[in-house]
Amino acid sequence: MKCPRLLTRILNARKTLTYGLLLLVLGGILGLKSLGHHTASQLECNSITLPAEQTLPGAGALRIAFFSDIHNNAGLFNETIAHIEQARPDLIIFGGDFVVAYQRFMRTSWAVEGLRRLSAVAPCMGILGNHDYEKQEQVERVFHTAGVPLLRNGAVDWKTPAGTTLRIIGLGDYNEGDDAPERCMKACGQEEHPVLLLAHDPESRWRLRNYDWDFMLSGHTHAGQLGNPFTGTYISFRSSMPAGCYDFEGGRRVFVTRGVGSILGMRFFCTPELNIIELK
């Protein structure tokens, strides 16, 4: 009689252990998901100061608000606008991916109103990101209605607060095969003005190495949405420039933002950000 009882106890113990492990795994998954959603909601406004003459030679002192990768997140977009209104920049740049390719983008009044608020602060312009091409007509209509230009292989000459001319060039998306630098850029050494280049993916810099530009602003990477909590670095499998300011050939610089939104609404040790870039 002892053997069946012992066997029953063993089976019950195994069931208890199995259920316990399942609950532990489930709790871990839910906890991880909660952490990811929480981190993705913690928008930071980060400032960086760069020497003007080594970044945009001849442009003079300048304050640029730069944000990218909204990914249809109206709440974080409103937070971004509030930070920018407080910072009072001279120029506002959007680096692409206003939407998410797999989400609907139908009720767009929040986007139009937000872009209009930004335009009331300072001159504002942007570019398309790879996700935007899935909803290109809607995105372009939103920006047009708000009066904010989207540069797609085009350039504008903008008068800086110092009275100098800054050439701002915006490219179509590199990953979508829509970038055409030959339409709007000159060969190295041919530009008469400092050039601020807007390109959604920082990896496109290699294609642009023989064109004349000084400072490139990019997004796209989200800094991998994953950070190393021990080193403070970011883990990205698709870019050698996940986030921050990098030196490039010919004394040029590339600045990559971590972005505002995120894919699947989760980040780990990698908070979203907008950037205030001070050139002094």
Named regions from a protein language model:
Residues M1-G58:
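N-terminal membrane-anchoring alpha-helices
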Residues C3-R14, Y19-L22, W206-N210, L264-K280:
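A short C-terminal boundary segment appended to hydrolase-like catalytic domains
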Residues P202-I276:
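Conserved beta-sheet core of the metallophosphoesterase superfamily
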Residues F66-N72, G96-V99, N130-D132, G154-A155, ...:
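Active-site metal-binding loops of divalent metal-dependent hydrolases
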Residues P51-A65, V148, V156-G170, D247-V254:
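Beta-strand-turn-beta hairpins that frame and shape the catalytic cleft
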Residues A40-G75, I169-P202:
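Mobile, glycine- and charge-enriched loop segments
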Residues G58-L151:
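Membrane-embedded segments
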Residues R141-P149, G154-A155, T160-A199, R205-W206, ...:
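Binuclear metal-dependent hydrolase catalytic cores centered on His/Asp/Glu-rich metal-binding motifs
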